[in-house]
């Protein structure tokens, strides 16, 4: 399956959550992305109470086979019904049929488990997803927001049973959130899974939307005008990272968001950022990051301010090399898969 270097996130399609875009503005964002060569779209049954799927389905209808549509299931559609959310088979089959109806299509290119529910057995999840593939309702499978051990367990089980395995991961990844570098990203690389990154601009933090330096601000009416999201994104550490991004943006004469996306492309060109926009100009700005090359010194500053502690056991491996290999490491071919 061939996808564009950037995925268009459509969580902003629709105004039912109070901060999205109208149908007309969403259509312009869609057309801007397609005109730039984009073919990969991300949505979910949960986004804007179904508006996102309905709009996207309408926009792609005349050329459906030209586009790669990914949607997700798991988050509840009815907080009073214990079966209206979760990874289990009942919610899976209900959700996929409702998404197909809203999208106005008879197949979904990539169907994502939105978040691990920590209850449903992996065998039930993978068997149910494989059934959807065999029925032709879904072509490829992915999982979002799950621990590496569970993804490995689920895929090993699927391969052993002859079922369809997860082909891609969707994880939060940005300069302010690098913890997938501990286990999830190495697993994806070693097993050939595509990684898509949600919130690559940290909810707008890395665009300067919420200020830098001493001039910090919240944004009433934005999606971070919410206690949980605000506390997650608007932290002292994240503002420190944004300050460094701002200094490099000033040096390059480019917007902050382009610096953040250029850093991600340098870390791993195979990571596909999911970029959202309420207006075409915002999307154009993000897409223009493709030709920005940062210097080694600038990349070093970004790494230094955002680096995470790998913890155990990751942090000990470099220290253990001499104890394992003695003086022979330089004579060993380490260009091996998984090294």
Regions found by a protein language model. Name each.
Residues 8, 26, 41, 56, ...:
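Conserved, mostly hydrophobic/aromatic
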Residues 1-6, 37-40, 64-67, 105-109, ...:
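Short, well-ordered coil/turn segments that N-cap beta-strands
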Residues 214-251, 266-270, 284-339:
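Terminal-tail/helix-coil boundary detector
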Residues 180-221, 255:
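Aromatic-lined glycan-binding groove of carbohydrate-active enzymes
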Residues 1-67, 134, 339:
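N-terminal binding-site loop/beta-alpha segment at the start of enzyme catalytic domains
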Residues 1-17, 70-83, 107, 112:
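N-terminal small/glycine-rich loop or linker at the start of catalytic domains
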Residues 11-13, 44-46, 72-76, 113-116, ...:
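Active-site beta-loop-alpha junctions enriched in small/polar residues
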Residues 79-183, 190:
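Glycine/proline-rich, positively charged
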